[in-house]
């Protein structure tokens, strides 16, 4: 059963990591996919090729989500190519680890612009298009377990992910009358580009694995299923929800 048959799905930050897994997962479930990416062309084009190999259409649109115009351009290009927007997966994010007391101003500002402002304007642009279309839609934002817990070297990052979580709650209310559902996924420790240097520390990695009841760290593909589910009509009565995808880490307090 393909959960997204005939849908058009947009995914930000999709050349690698969770975004890439979500884009490919959507294609596996029958969707055409537009991906946003900010840096290297190679990984983005290989993602497009992988989606096309599944028999679906795909485009890659380069742009920095910190610029509000990027959101408008991304949605417009998707509509030009596919004719509509059914699902937005707002995933793009950064986390340059740094101590709190000497945190550079530019690191704080860049993190907020990418993670929170970028999510806001992508969600808004997609919602505007969905309202124009008149047949509802689904928005899934990638927040983090860090929306619920702190991190010594993430004082600039955790507020942005709490903000994304809150954004989905508020937009669920604002957009419900238009038939647009808004939900978030909260990944735990997932092996991606964002934390590969941090988890290169074997002692740190083993500690995080031990904290996880399922006994392993997550892979990007572990997020694809939950994202596809929330995007699909299987979740037609789910909005304003937050789904932890963390191997049980959050509940392991002892």
Curated annotation (Swiss-Prot):
GO molecular function terms noted in the UniProt entry: nucleotide binding; oxidoreductase activity, acting on the CH-OH group of donors, NAD or NADP as acceptor; quinone binding
Pathway in which the depicted protein is active: Carbohydrate degradation; L-rhamnose degradation
Catalysis: reaction(s): L-rhamnofuranose + NAD(+) = L-rhamnono-1,4-lactone + NADH + H(+); L-rhamnofuranose + NADP(+) = L-rhamnono-1,4-lactone + NADPH + H(+)
GO terms of biological process kind: fatty acid biosynthetic process; rhamnose metabolic process
PANTHER family per UniProt: (3R)-3-HYDROXYACYL-COA DEHYDROGENASE, SHORT-CHAIN DEHYDROGENASES/REDUCTASES FAMILY MEMBER
Its biological purpose: NAD(P)-dependent dehydrogenase that catalyzes the oxidation of L-rhamnose to L-rhamnono-1,4-lactone. Also shows high activity with L-lyxose and low activity with L-mannose. Can utilize either NAD(+) or NADP(+), with a slight preference for NADP(+). Catalyzes the first step in an alternative pathway for rhamnose utilization that does not involve phosphorylated intermediates.
Family note: Belongs to the short-chain dehydrogenases/reductases (SDR) family.
Name assigned to this protein: L-rhamnose 1-dehydrogenase (NAD(P)(+))
Annotated source species: Sphingomonas sp. (strain SKA58)
Source lineage: Bacteria, Pseudomonadati, Pseudomonadota, Alphaproteobacteria, Sphingomonadales
